[in-house]
Curated annotation (Swiss-Prot):
It comes from the Bacteria. It comes from Bacillus thuringiensis subsp. sotto. Pfam families: Cry1Ac_D5, Endotoxin_C, Endotoxin_M. Promotes colloidosmotic lysis by binding to the midgut epithelial cells of insects. GO terms for biological process: sporulation resulting in formation of a cellular spore. This is Pesticidal crystal protein Cry14Aa. GO terms for molecular function: signaling receptor binding; toxin activity. Toxic segment of the protein is located in the N-terminus.
């Protein structure tokens, strides 16, 4: 909107861009990987472009080098619906590790990347000889694995790798045996090389390299076994040969199961070795050292180990997502930075009070994931009268989505608080104590400390902080961990604190960035169209009365385990997003004898299963006798393996499912619950409409039938061959139009209705009604063309997203049981993120005094807010529409989403699949541009929606009574808007005028004018503005966001120009005393505008700086400009040069024209009294016209 503020063209910065975080870069690259994988399955050709970009990004430090590899491995079981190619995941792994097909160069890059990560996170490095050995080992696996991968591809595709347009084929017995031979040879070679490398130095520094090699070998097994499972019965072996090959395959599967556990134990031996793992002591530095080690090993080794079991293709047959709830820890910050001391850590979650009990023996392994999303952190700050240098945080409040917890040396509730919104990826603090101040700042909140560091800072070595030899300043340097976010804070106190002991100290626990505290399954991957197999840690369940479950540490699972005793009850509620068939299973360890547990499953409040299940002992002997086909890995509390809890051919509808597990007579340990889709989703039809009636497919997009309760899920395709069917369908096509000219749609025809009629036309028999079908399809496409022309929304059927603003986990999917064509799917996002879709219709497209109809079709939804707004949320509804499976397509004038007598097909019901609202437009205001806004937003972290057929169309002119009503709304809205504009203009116009005065021709793009000084810029304060965020979507910029960003960037632009002209480095003192040589008592002072200034406190205090003038000309004039107060002198060169002298009780501005005889000069600032404060100093070359 235009508030009559002076408009400015964009300055040379992208002022509206939101900086892309590491996590966003990861998500984008992971999406590219999935698309490349999908294309690989369709064509047999793997594009390395995305992998090359991902590798380059990881080398640039954008994200952890293993994160994308884990993302790629999750695709191991994915498939293209309708396809037959068994794509080897090892091809993805090879491509990620060696993306440029240059074995030597890529391996060197990989080794370098890993080595840098390990040195950064663990302060460990390989010896040169060991590095060479691991390089040779990884290269050998590359060679042998690539041979097998190529054989698997060639067995299923015609031609060779150089052939264009290769076609899929069924492997022959020769093809199959070639793959077997290549695999046997490759695995034998890998084992030999592995035995050699393991005889060397296998320690912490080598563990990440071993994990890479192990993952590659297991990926090779996965690819080979998956290929054999798919083709062993199809290639045409004789009975004897088939039996031989099946026996060989069984031995290979046994080897893979055994290898997974053996590899896991090798890693755990190194990880837990007392020579490597520090001991948790009573002092702070010992806990920090332990946390550094565990975090480095978790991110670089253990997170990958945790997913090895999911590579076993007999257990994980589809695309997989195993949630990891393990926690890592930052270094402790605050209290007294850089100083060791006896430590006490407090348990934030033991009570709702601000006072808490101690965590026994500082054992951070007792800290586990808190199952909620940290929305924001509020710090309570103590600010005595002594000034800002004496302030410090003394307490905090952690605000979660469903709870809050606090800590303080007194209750922070009701006190002034400083808030930091989530997601928070790092926490750091600085402390400073001297004769003149005693302060602390945490994440920039607290004291304004003038100190600076004179030493470097290492997050992996004592003292875990940078320090100053000049001013007792100390600051932590916790990094922003890739793909991690803070889950909770734990307060600590220590001895050896200088000054006030009330200063806050905190330890932060971190979890994976995309971890959602809500349990959801049935996510549909928009790239692969697969329903994802989901593993949910048991610690995300709950005990009776919603109590947090007791947990024990497990290193190998990516989550803590829940010990389950006799009589215990564990609940887990999860939201299903896709109606299909599922199997539910448990991953557990039972170190005792066989036991039975009770399993009760309810769905949307109704019981669907109640049984007792035997959980077999998982000791080594029991596994070999009772569960010989199972993969297991040995953890701290026993061997973990899988067992089915529930399996059925019925379709689980969407909504909440609750598992209630009741303990038996033996103690067991539950790792996670898994939800496995067992029925594929429909394959895409790729329908495209055009005016010639050719939409690329003659059949409706439905494939098969299933039963959900008493309701039939039909997926045809049906075929109408009776003349009576043709007549009924023809009548329905004609009814779409207002007249036989077919130039205007009937008044009440909707997008959904056109799609339904299209399905019926597509189901007409080609053999019997070829010409009639062609003509009817042409009319249906004409109806779609007219529909698009009248719809004020662009992409109402999501055929384009050009005008839509989409949030996290907002996907455009195609054809399902309920939709013909594209539809929007909003899926749950991690906590503070919001899945949303938003579009604004511009004022210029509207008519005055007109009623508009807003309608749409919802496949299913849960806790989704719909808003339609012009004058202020005229329509604001929460959409909760349960899934109802489609009925068969018939020739009658009925719809397939549900039976007509069902309430969900009644648009007047709150849970209807259809919605239909009206919104009135009064007078038009092009200068304010209110338009019509429509938005959909998930309001709970387990919310979801599938929706399409959205329309906003002109309905009719308003009546006289309606005009009167809308005029009252319009006038009230306009009056408030103009008052707001006037208020903002009054606030901003003086600031804009000040900024205009900085630049030539008042153009913020231009050069700054000669009069501009640092003090000029420091005196311009951009005020706090309203509506910086969008009124409905917090993640979108609000009305005044753009002007605020432009002003800030203009000031930054001016500051940068001034800094470039200034021959004195750090003359603004914004970076403390960097670039200055200090003598005596020199420190930083915080002025009233929060700007930093140089303070010389004694007669003998001074700072100096050497300056070299490039392209020196002794006839060139320079201007020295100083803003200072107190008593002091500023002088260049030797004693004969005239000095600028200050002797004033207030700040004054002085300038002087200077000539130099030599290009190398020395600037000296000297105190001549008890205090000399310099706010800024600059030396600029004068132009000829100055």
């Amino acid at each position: 909107m235009d508030c009559n503020l002076q408009s400015q063209q964009n300055i040379p910065y992208n002022v509206l861009a939101i900086p892309v975080s590491n996590v966003n870069a990861l998500v984008d690259t992971a999406g590219d990987l999935k698309k490349a994988w999908e294309e690989f399955q369709k064509t047999g050709s793997f594009s390395l472009t995305a992998l090359q970009q991902g590798f380059s990004a990881s080398q640039g430090g954008a994200f952890n080098y293993l994160t994308l590899l884990q993302s790629g491995i999750s695709l191991a079981g994915s498939f293209v619906p309708g396809g037959t190619f068994v794509a080897p995941i090892v091809n993805m792994v090879i491509g990620w590790l060696w993306p440029h097909k240059n074995k030597t160069a890529d391996t060197e890059n990989l080794i370098k990347l890993i080595d840098e990560e390990i040195q950064k996170q663990l302060n460990k490095a390989l010896l040169d000889q060991d590095r060479n050995n691991w390089t040779s080992f990884l290269e050998s696996i590359f060679d042998t694995s690539a041979t097998v991968s190529n054989a698997i591809i060639d067995a299923q595709w015609s031609g060779t790798v150089d052939t264009t347009n290769r076609q899929q084929k069924t492997p022959t017995t020769s093809d199959y045996l070639n793959v077997v031979g290549k695999f046997d040879s490759a695995d034998s070679s890998i084992i030999t090389n592995e035995n050699q490398i393991m005889n060397g130095n296998f320690d912490v520094a080598a563990a990440p390299y071993f994990v890479i090699g192990a993952t590659l070998r297991l990926s090779l097994y996965q690819s080979y076994i998956k290929f054999c499972n798919s083709w062993i019965d199809a290639v045409g072996f004789s009975t004897n040969d088939a039996n031989t090959q099946k026996a060989n395959l069984a031995r290979t599967k046994l080897t893979m199961r055994t290898t997974i556990n053996e590899y896991t134990q090798r890693v755990m031996k190194v990880f837990k070795d007392s020579k490597n793992m520090p001991t948790i002591g009573t002092n702070k530095f010992s806990v920090d050292a332990y946390n550094v080690y565990v975090k480095g090993m978790t991110l670089n080794v253990l997170d990958m180990v945790a997913i090895w079991s999911s590579l076993y293709p007999n257990d994980y047959t589809s695309q997989t997502a195993i949630e990891q709830t393990r926690v890592t820890f930052s270094n402790m910050v605050g209290q007294e930075e850089g100083t060791d001391g006896t430590l006490k850590i407090y348990n934030t979650f033991d009570s709702l009070s601000y006072q808490h009990s101690l965590i026994p023996n500082n054992n951070v392994n007792l800290i586990s994931y808190y199952t909620d999303e940290l929305q924001n952190l509020e710090l309570a700050v103590y600010t005595p009268k002594g000034g800002s240098g004496y302030a410090y945080p003394y307490g905090f409040i952690l605000n979660y989505a469903n709870s809050n917890y606090k800590y303080g040396d007194n209750d922070p509730t009701g006190k002034p608080l400083n808030k930091q919104d989530g997601p928070i990826q790092q926490i750091n603090a600085a402390t400073q104590n001297s004769k003149y101040l005693d302060g602390e700042t945490i994440n920039g909140i607290g004291a304004s400390l003038p100190g600076y560091c004179t030493t470097g800072c290492s997050a992996t070595e004592q003292p875990f902080s940078c320090t100053s030899t000049a001013n007792s300043y100390k600051a932590s340097c916790n990094p922003s961990d890739t793909n991690q976010k803070i889950n909770a804070l734990y307060a600590f106190t220590q001895t050896n604190v200088k000054g006030s002991t009330g200063k806050l100290g905190v330890l932060a626990s971190l979890v994976p960035y995309d971890l959602n505290p809500k349990n959801v399954f049935g996510e549909l991957d928009s790239d692969t169209n697969n329903v994802i197999l989901k593993g949910i840690p048991a610690e995300k369940g709950y005990f009776p009365n919603n109590a947090r479950p007791t947990v024990v540490k497990e290193w190998i699972n990516g989550a803590s385990a829940v010990p389950f005793y006799s009589g215990n009850t564990l609940f887990m509620t999860a939201t299903n997003l896709t109606a299909t068939q599922y199997k539910i299973r448990i991953r557990y360890a039972n170190p005792n004898s066989d036991t039975q547990i009770g399993v009760l499953i309810t769905q949307n409040g109704s019981q669907i299963s109640n049984s007792n299940l035997t959980l077999y002992s998982t000791t080594d002997s029991s596994m070999s006798s009772n569960l010989p086909q199972n993969v297991y890995v040995t953890g701290e509390n026993g061997n973990y393996t899988l067992l089915d809890l529930y399996s059925t051919t019925n379709v689980l509808s969407t909504g909440d499912i609750t598992l209630k597990l009741t303990g038996g007579n033996q103690k067991i340990f539950i790792d996670r619950i898994e939800f496995i889709p067992t029925m594929p989703v429909p394959a895409p039809t790729n329908n495209t409409n055009n005016n010639n009636g050719d939409n690329g497919n003659n059949n409706p997009p439905h494939h098969g039938c299933a039963i959900a309760g008493t309701q039939q899920l039909c997926s045809g395709p049906p075929k109408f061959e009776q003349v009576s069917d043709l007549e009924k369908i023809t009548t329905q096509v004609y009814m779409l139009f207002k007249s036989s000219s077919y130039e205007e749609l009937a008044l009440k025809v909707s997008s959904y209705q056109i799609n339904q009629v299209a399905l019926k036309v597509m189901a007409l028999s080609d053999e019997k009604f070829c010409e009639e079908k062609r003509l009817l399809r042409k009319l249906v496409n004409k109806a779609n063309q007219l529909l698009e022309a009248r719809n004020l929304l662009v992409g109402g059927n999501f055929e384009t997203t050009q005008n839509w603003v989409l949030g996290t986990n907002a996907y455009i999917n195609y054809d399902s049981f309920l939709f013909n064509g594209n539809y929007l799917s909003l899926q749950p996002a991690s906590g503070f993120f919001t899945s949303y879709a938003y579009q604004k219709i511009d004022e210029s497209t509207l008519k005055p005094y007109t009623r508009y109809k807003v309608s749409g079709f919802i496949g299913q939804s849960n806790q989704v807010e719909l808003i339609i707004s012009r004058y202020g949320k005229e329509i604001d509804k929460i959409l909760n529409v349960p899934y109802a499976g489609p009925l068969p397509i018939t020739a009658d004038a009925s719809i397939t989403c549900c039976a007509p007598e069902i309430d969900q097909c009644d648009g007047g019901q709150s849970d209807s699949h259809f919605f239909n609202y009206s919104i009135d437009v009064g007078a038009l205001h092009p200068e304010l541009n209110p338009g019509i806004e429509i938005g959909l937003k998930i309001v709970q972290s387990n919310g979801y929606i599938t929706i399409s057929n959205l329309e906003i169309i002109e309905e009719r002119p308003l009546t006289e009574m309606e005009i009167q009503a809308v005029n009252r709304k319009d006038q009230k809205w306009k009056r408030e808007k103009l008052l707001e504009c006037a208020s903002v203009s009054e606030l901003l116009q003086p600031i804009i005028n000040q900024i205009d005065s900085l630049f030539k021709d008042a153009n913020w793009y231009n050069d700054i004018l000669p009069h501009v000084t640092y003090q000029t810029l420091k005196n311009i304060i951009v005020p706090d503005l309203p509506k910086l965020k969008h009124w409905f979507i917090d993640h979108l910029p609000g009305e005044y966001h753009e002007i605020e960003q432009k002003m800030k960037e203009a000031l930054k632009h001016a500051f940068t120009q001034l800094d470039e002209k200034n021959l004195i480095h750090n003359g603004h003192f914004a970076t403390n005393l960097i670039d200055w040589q200090v003598e005596g008592d020199a420190r930083m002072k915080v002025l009233e505008n929060n700007a930093l200034a140089l303070q010389l406190s004694n007669w003998d205090s001074s700072v100096s700086q050497s300056i070299d003038i490039l392209e020196f000309d002794e006839d060139k004039a320079y201007k020295l400009r100083v803003y200072a107060q107190g008593s002091g002198t500023i002088q260049f060169g030797n004693c004969e040069d005239e000095a600028i002298q200050f002797n004033t009780n207030s700040f004054v501005y002085k300038e002087k024209i200077i000539y130099f005889d030599t290009p190398s000069i020395n600037l000296h600032i000297q105190s001549e009294g008890s205090e000399f404060v310099v706010s800024s100093i600059d030396l600029v070359e004068l132009s000829d016209d100055e």
